[in-house]
């Protein structure tokens, strides 16, 4: 895959505090994307963002409950205000059962 095509693009990744969402956020940032990491856990989400930044990436954290439509609107608004645009969304948020 040619990751040069994503360089400079802006994406929201939900569920970015761990698991698949975290891996996607890290991969995007490592390949030059600007990433908005969204998750419910401030501590875990901010830790991911701090690590991305410490490794030369560009990311912000927005605490978000993806079951709340107003929170989703706020997430998109914050992304656009911070980066000036939004190129994509990875909808990865979920709830563990069991």
Regions found by a protein language model. Give the residues of each.
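The beta1-alpha1 cofactor-binding region of Rossmann-like NAD(H)/NADP(H)-dependent oxidoreductases
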Residues: 42, 63-75
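Conserved glycine-rich cofactor-binding loop
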Residues: 10, 17-19, 41
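Aromatic pocket-lining residues of Rossmann-like dinucleotide-binding sites
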Residues: 28
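Conserved glycine-rich Rossmann-like NAD(P)H-binding loop of the short-chain dehydrogenase/reductase
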Residues: 31-48
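Helix N-cap/beta-alpha junction loops of NAD(P)-dependent oxidoreductase domains
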Residues: 96-98
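Rossmann-fold scaffold of SDR-type NAD(P)-dependent oxidoreductases
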Residues: 14, 86-94
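Flexible N-terminal pre-Rossmann segment of NAD(P)-dependent oxidoreductases
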Residues: 1-12
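Hydrophobic/aromatic anchor residues within beta-strands of the central parallel beta-sheet
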Residues: 59-61
């Amino acid at each position: 895959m040619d990751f040069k095509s994503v360089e400079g693009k802006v994406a929201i990744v939900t569920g970015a505090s761990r698991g698949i969402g975290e891996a996607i956020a890290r991969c995007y940032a490592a390949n030059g994307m600007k990433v908005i990491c969204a998750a419910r856990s401030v501590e875990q989400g901010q830790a991911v963002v701090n690590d991305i930044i410490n490794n030369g990436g560009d990311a912000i954290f927005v605490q978000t409950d993806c079951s709340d439509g107003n929170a989703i609107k706020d997430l998109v608004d914050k992304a656009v205000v911070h980066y000036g645009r939004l190129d994509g969304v990875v909808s990865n948020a979920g709830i563990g059962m069991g």
